[in-house]
Swiss-Prot record:
Note on domains (UniProt): Two N-terminal domains regulate binding to and modulation by KCNIP1.
Keywords, comma-separated and alphabetical: Cell membrane, Cell projection, Ion channel, Ion transport, Membrane, Metal-binding, Phosphoprotein, Potassium, Potassium channel, Potassium transport, Transmembrane, Transmembrane helix, Transport, Voltage-gated channel, Zinc
Native organism: Rattus norvegicus (Rat)
Chain residues that bind Zn(2+): H104, C110, C131, C132
BP GO annotations: action potential; cellular response to BMP stimulus; membrane repolarization; membrane repolarization during ventricular cardiac muscle cell action potential; potassium ion export across plasma membrane; potassium ion import across plasma membrane; potassium ion transmembrane transport; potassium ion transport
Compartment(s) of residence: Cell membrane; Cell membrane, Sarcolemma; Cell projection, Dendrite
Stated name of the protein: A-type voltage-gated potassium channel KCND3
């Protein structure tokens, strides 16, 4: 054995240093790691729009949906792609985030929809790039404020029945259209505000001269009349302020509010003037107090939506206005200093100091140019021209931002008012539908008023249509949907008074026990032939509808003691014929029952696979004339010829 080892050992050593191979065949390659995933292209289908990217691109962020294994739940084995039923426009920004690592906010997208998409993909909005983050935060804040206002208005409407006296009074002050008394008080205060402002202006107009003195203003010549007007206005303003203070939810916040301060400043000069004497030492202070009466004009902001929107605009543009003020201050100081030293050598110069040059700089930068101070030297004229041009640039920059904010806030308020009006109209229509009877439903069915998406705008025609269109229509349509979904059968409309015989197809019958006995009794009182209703037609083995309610003819029931209104409603009552589902190509569904019937269809009654079931419309309320005059249901007589029903009965609740 030692000899054998000695024989091949030199060859192994020679092969180790590369002199000769150990074997004639090459050695096999090292086994590859099969678990190592190769990079590949994957397809992301977002609502039909296909996106392609590398798998490693998505795996950069494993904490998100697309970067984790959770995306495998959305993999489609048939198409070999990931399908997401989401917004494809927002997904472009999401995919660019995986590619570049920067998340951007598209300004044309709704902020709520954008947040929902980011939450779905597991991306935090805090990583939005600096170029879009300010815009995103502004839109987020505006949307939150708008939603807060909508929620407050909805809460006020929902909690209306349980409001206290103070809450009712505060609601009347904030929304004068809630009651007639609040609306009257609203217009009365607005009238006295206008009278107060006009009085403050007219009392300074000269009203003739007095012998031996100069012209007297109207306020001094007719002092008693103006004092009475001022007293009446101040009394109204005082009562309004005290009532608002009493009804305010938080009196501390109300006192600190801007409008409360304006109210106090508007009425305090009158009371201070009553206690002040005509001493010359205090006459200057009295004149100063009378100047504050002009602030009463700001009380119009409660009566003007445009003024309130302007205030909101200035508040939202506080940063832009601060930038404008800071820029103007810097420019005024710089150009005032330059103009002072440029005009210092001129003997007739009016630029005596830098603060005196402020006036020229302000007037020049605002492009007013009164001409009371003008430069005399060439250097002063050059710097004055530069000051005028720079003022145009500095002032013009923030103006488009302020205008755009005003337009945006104005349109938001307009849309909010429109939504509140539409919601109020829908609630009123539902309230009318709840108090309506079955005749209103049948009347709307007969006239084809089935447009539930109608929005009321205040016209008399639309108001009448809103009253006749009730909620029962949508409930009836939904019930028929559920019946077809449960049984797999098609439903056809027919007249119950022309055919009340029952036959079984698949042991299904839908019947309302509330009116079954009375319908049987009424059908036994008639002597109609036992033929099928002419409201059914057959075409190629399929059954379609031909609603007989479209005809205007009224059929009077013989030997019936029921009122005429009840007979008409019973003639308009519908039954539902059920056809077996052996034929898979049925073209009639429950959704067509609430549509207008095709008047061009020819009635044909040669079908045998029909069974009759009755679904009754709710009986009129006891408060209606029909409910009062309708007799109680009687048991069927002995002559009632109705075959026994051996099928299962499915009881349908009354709509």
């Amino acid at each position: 054995m030692a000899a054998g080892v000695a024989a091949w050992l030199p060859f192994a050593r020679a092969a180790a240093i590369g002199w000769m191979p150990v074997a004639n065949c090459p050695m096999p390659l090292a086994p590859a790691d099969k678990n190592k995933r190769q990079d590949e292209l994957i397809v992301l289908n977002v609502s039909g729009r296909r996106f392609q990217t590398w798998r490693t691109t998505l795996e950069r962020y494993p904490d998100t949906l697309l970067g984790s294994t959770e995306k495998e739940f959305f993999f489609n084995e048939d198409t070999k792609e990931y399908f997401f039923d989401r917004d494809p426009e927002v997904f472009r920004c999401v995919l660019n985030f995986y590619r570049t690592g920067k998340l951007h906010y598209p300004r044309y997208e709704c902020i709520s929809a954008y947040d929902d998409e980011l939450a779905f993909y597991g991306i935090l909005p805090e990583i939005i790039g600096d170029c879009c983050y300010e815009e995103y935060k502004d839109r987020k804040r505006e949307n939150a404020e708008r939603l807060m206002d909508d929620n407050e208005s909805e809460n006020n409407q929902e909690s209306m029945p349980s409001l206290s006296f103070r809450q009712t009074m505060w609601r009347a002050f904030e929304n004068p259209h809630t009651s007639t008394l609040a609306l009257v008080f609203y217009y009365v205060t607005g009238f006295f505000i206008a009278v107060s402002v006009i009085t403050n202006v007219v009392e300074t107009v000269p009203c003739g001269t007095v012998p031996g003195s100069k012209e007297l203003p109207c306020g001094e010549r007719y002092s008693v009349a103006f004092f009475c007007l001022d007293t009446a206005c101040v009394m109204i303003f005082t009562v309004e302020y005290l009532l608002r203070l009493f009804a305010a939810p938080s009196r501390y916040r109300f006192i600190r509010s801007v409008m409360s301060i304006i109210d106090v400043v508007a009425i305090m000069p009158y009371y201070i003037g009553l206690v002040m004497t005509n001493n010359e030492d205090v006459s200057g202070a009295f004149v100063t107090l009378r100047v504050f009466r002009v602030f009463r004009i700001f009380k119009f902001s409660r009566h003007s939506q445009g003024l309130r929107i302007l205030g909101y605009t200035l508040k939202s543009c506080a940063s832009e206005l601060g930038f404008l003020l800071f820029s103007l201050t810097m420019a005024i100081i710089i150009f005032a200093t330059v103009m002072f030293y440029a005009e210092k050598g001129s003997s007739a110069s009016k630029f005596t100091s830098i603060p005196a040059s402020f006036w020229y700089t302000i007037v020049t930068m605002t492009t007013l140019g009164y001409g009371d101070m003008v430069p005399k030297t060439i250097a002063g004229k050059i710097f004055g021209s530069i000051c005028s041009l720079s003022g145009v640039l500095v002032i013009a920059l923030p103006v488009p931002v302020i205008v755009s904010n005003f337009s945006r806030i104005y349109h938001q308020n307009q849309r909010a008012d429109k939504r509140r009006a539409q919601k109020k109209a829908r609630l009123a229509r539902i309230r009318v539908a709840k108090t309506g009877s079955s005749n209103a439903y049948l009347h709307s069915k007969r006239n084809g008023l089935l447009n539930e998406a109608l929005e009321l705008t205040g016209t008399p025609e639309e108001e009448h249509m809103g009253k006749t269109t009730s909620l029962i229509e949508s409930q009836h349509h939904h019930l028929l949907h559920c019946l077809e979904k449960t049984t797999g059968l098609s439903y056809l409309v027919d007249d119950p008074l022309l055919s009340v015989r029952t036959s079984t197809i698949k042991n299904h019958e839908f019947i309302d026990e509330q009116m079954f006995e009375q319908n049987c009794m009424e059908s036994s009182m008639q002597n109609y032939p036992s033929t099928r209703s002419p409201s059914l037609s057959s075409h190629s083995g399929l059954t379609t509808t031909c609603c007989s309610r479209r005809s205007k003819k009224t059929t009077h029931l013989p030997n019936s003691n029921l009122p005429a209104t009840r007979l008409r409603s019973m003639q308009e009552l519908s039954t539902i014929h059920i056809q077996g589902s052996e034929q898979p190509s049925l073209t009639t569904s429950r959704s067509s029952l609430n549509l207008k019937a095709d008047d061009g269809l020819r009635p044909n009654c040669k079908t045998s696979q029909i069974t009759t079931a009755i679904i009754s419309i709710p009986t009129p309320p006891a408060l209606t004339p029909e409910g009062e005059s309708r007799p109680p249901p009687a048991s069927p007589g002995p002559n009632t010829n109705i075959p026994s029903i051996t099928s299962n009965v499915v009881k349908v609740s009354v709509l």
